[in-house]
Amino acid sequence: MSQIAINKIYETDFYQWTIEQAQALREQNFQELDWENIIEEIEALGRSDYSAVASLLMREIEHRLKIDYANRPECDRHWRSEMVAFRKNIKRRLSPSMKPKLEKDFSEIYQDAVEIVLAKYDLNLPTTC
């Protein structure tokens, strides 16, 4: 199959493209591989996984801030259960190579959580964690 045909399948039927690319990899049929799009998709997978973990961390911080500062005891149990779920999902999805980037981005993640809480509650929250 020509590279143009492979690219067309990528653009029009992504699912079919994944099936064909996986088959070409299994068969080590390297001339049938759409290297450019494979590289982009692998990079996108990494970004997506990182984004999911960062989002879960932000939600956990958001709920911790609500528990500590919103003074809504009737909501605490729900918020705590949500935090447990976020933490379990983080643990499941976190890979060692994400940790340095999360540490680098932590201040921004924290600020996003603060912004979400302040959109709902009029509170004095710490500007840094």
For each feature predicted by the language model, list its residue ranges.
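Surface/interface-facing alpha-helical segments and adjacent flexible terminal/loop regions used
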Residues: 1-58, 64-129
